[in-house]
From Swiss-Prot:
Residues the record marks as active site: Y149 (proton acceptor)
Spans through the membrane: 279-299, 365-385
Its EC number(s): 1.1.1.-
Source organism (scientific name): Danio rerio
Protein's UniProt name: Short-chain dehydrogenase/reductase family 42E member 1
Positions contributing to NAD(+) binding: K153
Keywords: Membrane, NAD, Oxidoreductase, Transmembrane, Transmembrane helix
Main location: membrane
Record-stated family: Belongs to the 3-beta-HSD family.
InterPro entries, per database record: 3Beta_OHSteriod_DH/Estase (IPR002225), Lipid_A_modif_metabolic_enz (IPR050177), NAD(P)-bd_dom_sf (IPR036291)
GO cellular-component term (any): membrane
Topology term for the membrane: Multi-pass membrane protein
Amino acid sequence: MEVNRKDNSFLITGGGGYFGFRLACALLKTSSKVVLFDVSPPIQDLPEGLIFMRADIRDYAQVEKAVRGSHCVFHIASYGMSGREQLNRKLIEEVNVKGTENILRACVAHSVPRLIYTSTFNVVFGGQEIKNGDESLPYLPLHLHPDHYSRTKSIAEMQVLKANNLALSNSTGVLRTCALRPAGIYGPGEQRHLPRIVSYIENGIFRFVYGDPDSLVEFVHVDNLVSAHLLAADALTEKQQCRAAGQAYFISDGRPVNNFEFFRPLVEGLGYSFPTLRLPISMIYFFAFLTEMVHFVVGRIYNFQPLLTRTEVYKTGVTHYFSMRKAREELGYEPKLYDLEDVVQWFQARGHGKKRSRSSIRKLILDVFVVVAFVAVLLSCLPVVGQ
């Protein structure tokens, strides 16, 4: 795939993260300048020609400095996607909403003609079943979002699409914007979800699955997501009749799959047995609710990592998948086939995998812990005697 990127300067907010860095490396092959904007640098060494700018998206002065001179901005930066991050409402609001406002304001002020926003499936999903949905679906009402991350991402996406066709300062042109709504990202070296899953596997916590075995969700390999962003940037140019301007697109591998079956190759590839115990999703949701309540009470003293949040239960246990038709027809997006083989190899190369011997005492303690935890949840559901 060839995308016209010569003589262009690109800025990637959130460029220090896994996806942002992969996108930058792809852009660097043919563009004149690629700048990574983030509060932390990538864990990888920067290839020659890639520029890192340490800055905070909440600070307009820093955003303005970074945007100046750019021809296209990929706005990836966000906060609160998973785990305990989902429970920090203040920071989520500041990064996802105010940060997006800063980016839009700076793009207009410095006559940046293109902005691609990395959104999420969650702008239309809040726990309800969706089969082969498309972009005609309305936004989920803000008050129905089960978490603040999804709510603020929805607000930010609406801001971005509303900004399409805004007149640029000191220019006769306008700002062209679009939004991509990716599924859960995977690939070798992914640092948010996969390490957490592997830690659960290795620590003996992954002892059960939940929900309907026929429930289907979607994922997107990082390289497919990179491809979609490059195509979207090109589809905002005059050469491509700006056909993506003001549009949103669902992006995935296009292969709905049961969440737990998707990770089976990872579990078994690392030498562990796939769990056979299946629990009702209502029980897991209630457990997640209790965990969030405990975190709300003690989080400032001990900011522990919740096993699951309510949103994560929905995302992993309730059917929701979307059509790629619009992305295929308007962007030319054609996802390639990937599996978890390279992910398994990545973890194995770093010493992960079941060891030959394991303490039977440790295993017993873990088994007892799991049983006690779920007995406690069940007992908490029972009515109090005498009331």
